Amino acid sequence: LTNATEADPVLLPEPGVLPRALPTPRSISTPTLFGFSLGMIGDRIFRDTPALLLMLFMTDYLAIPPALAGVAIFVPKILIIFIDPMVGVTSDRLNTPWGRRRPLMLIGGVLASLSILMFFHVPRFGLAVPQAIYMSAMVLVGFTGYSLYSVPYLTMASEMASSDVERRTIMSWRVVFMAVGLSISAFAGGLAQSIGGGVKGYATMSWIYAAICLSTMLSTVVATGRIATSPGDGERFSLLDQFRLVAANKRYLRLVLVSFAQKLGEGVGYTSFGYFCIYVVHQPLSAFGLVVLASTAGQVLAQPLWLKASRRWSGPTLYTVGALGWCLNLLLWLAMKDQSPWWLIPLGLEAGAAAGGFQMVTLGMLSNTMAADATETGMN
């Protein structure tokens, strides 16, 4: 990525003739963009609510040792690395009256939403190990459902657009709705405390969040019913062949590796933030809401600026700026011990502005890389 120039090779140039594998060019209407992006709320609720609260719930309410809780969450997420490509292969091969993306999105949305309930309705085995095994199994089931939804959802974004500008616009909308989903997730802990706290409070909260997750994800499935996605090219590849194709696509491989490191860093930050907020900065769990509300505002307000900047500078350059801004924000948190909680607002604003940048750029480059690969290989 660091070798990219102003004419970013990851961003697809405007082609004179569209490849046969992609849909006919079209202008994407605002209602379509809204309906498509709405699913990002449920997407982020599923990802961020467990990321922010699950470790705390397991250690503080289920009495699972932190190391065991960490392993219980980490191991199934490693397995998901292998499930994602299998979902992609399945989605590419589907040929149904409802398209090849939406059936998996429907199944995944339902499964992911039900898993939110399972995360916070844990059988009381009386021992830490059986409870950790249960949680690990639920994480595997839940994130399998998330893969079934998110993999075809992201692919659909590249198929909807016929130019780089449209793809960046789609991703900018998604980042805004992503910020809304993250904001809702941030209030989950405070909501659980306000409706009784403890295991019962978390269980009640999970019903509310599962309903929001399900309604927004399925709304996108319905809203995208008229979006034409290209049929599969008929070629079939084994999973090993799929990994070989990925390894041969250097642009995609670089982007995936960078994205993996980014998601790993974000995940560590989200998971540790609850402990950091309570035990280091000495703020209540409800402070999550204040921080992420400010972060959401930062993401939304900064999106037009990032979108404008993406027309002038390369994706890797903007990604670097956003990532450095995020890292600087994390360092500033170290100086927040026993400080006024009002400092959380400017920190949240800066974090949101930075994160909104590198998230939009990453999604945009991924979508463009997929479109470029379809152009070069004729396969979709």
In which residue ranges do the predicted regions lie?
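Membrane-embedded alpha-helical bundles of multi-pass transporters/translocases
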Residues: T2-N380
